[in-house]
Amino acid sequence: DNIGVFDRSAPLPTGGHLEQADGTAWMALFSQNMLELAVELAAHDPTYEHMVFKFVEHFYYIAAAMNRPGQDGMWDEEDGFYYDLLQLPDGSATRLKVRSMVGLLPLCATTVIEKWQRQRVPRAMAHLAERMRRMPELWKTMHPTGPGHFGVADRGLMALVNPERLRRILTKMLDENEFF
């Protein structure tokens, strides 16, 4: 999948490397899908519970990388959109500010967590709560989850994008003058 505006698999003439917003979002979604499988396995065999921890951790690390604040993050606070990030050899970074599907794909990394799924892995849920307590800065940038944030039928939402960012991205996505 090479949906960028140039061939992202070729070496960069400037050196450095490209941090891809779409590829990173796909990996977050992959972690969510694997988490769902791990919950199913752990419900029948507790030896798989460590896999639940593993994929929760993977999702959090990916979310932290995508939502890193400042000039070296994929999220552009001023534009309200995700962009690929060019990391140059001198340590500086530049966002490639092209509105494309690249910036919309973080919306796909969203998983509904049912109450019964949480009940199947209580130790994993306790681990999640502890991780949330230790990473408060992350919860400002992704969708809040956990007690006090459950929705209809006590469902939770695990998403890269928090509600404010979701509204900002949708404003761009639904503006017929933004995407041609």
Each predicted region: which residue ranges?
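Acidic, mature catalytic/reactive cores of soluble proteins
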Residues: 1-180
